[in-house]
Amino acid sequence: METVFDINEIMKILPHRYPFLLVDRIVEHVPGERIVGIKNVTINEPFFQGHFPGHPIMPGVLIVEAMAQVGGILAYMASDDEVRNKVCYFASIDNVKFRKPVLPGDQLRIEVAATGCKRGIWCFSAKAIVKGKVTTQAELKATFADKDRL
């Protein structure tokens, strides 16, 4: 699997840092259309200490956050220089479905497709996949804003 953006390039785009940076690399990117990110889920993730002891499962909200981060990279890369000085914020989540748990040792493949952009609001369709099976799917919206505006 070829790496399009490595972790260093991702950290130049996203403001998130450990333990909240939830994408390790980008392996596919069609500018303004779609993107695929990878998150390697290890037992060392801090959330596994409490979710759940003896039966670790990646929290669904963090899977959705990983989708949003990958979508944010897609929107950022398709935007002009003015937007690149701003931060991409989550605007909404719709039609989320959790189909299968994500466990330590899984490699999460996050596929995000842009479905539109109106008045600065990006719309995405996203899927998280492990071993070829969809674990989570959602429709997301995001927008860019000045860091000090919110």
From Swiss-Prot:
Keywords: Cytoplasm, Lipid A biosynthesis, Lipid biosynthesis, Lipid metabolism, Lyase. The keyword Lipid metabolism applies. It is found in: Cytoplasm. SUPFAM superfamilies: Thioesterase/thiol ester dehydrase-isomerase. Its EC number is 4.2.1.59. CDD domains: FabZ (cd01288). Its main location: cytoplasm. Transmembrane segments: none annotated. The active site is at H51. The keyword RNA-binding does not apply. GO terms for cellular component: cytoplasm; membrane. GO terms for biological process: fatty acid biosynthetic process; lipid A biosynthetic process. It catalyses: a (3R)-hydroxyacyl-[ACP] = a (2E)-enoyl-[ACP] + H2O. GO terms for molecular function: (3R)-hydroxyacyl-[acyl-carrier-protein] dehydratase activity. It comes from the Bacteria. It is an enzyme of class 4 (lyase). Involved in unsaturated fatty acids biosynthesis. Catalyzes the dehydration of short chain beta-hydroxyacyl-ACPs and long chain saturated and unsaturated beta-hydroxyacyl-ACPs. PANTHER family: 3-HYDROXYACYL-[ACYL-CARRIER-PROTEIN] DEHYDRATASE. Belongs to the thioester dehydratase family. FabZ subfamily. This is 3-hydroxyacyl-[acyl-carrier-protein] dehydratase FabZ. It comes from Geobacter metallireducens (strain ATCC 53774 / DSM 7210 / GS-15). The lineage of its organism: Bacteria, Pseudomonadati, Thermodesulfobacteriota, Desulfuromonadia, Geobacterales.
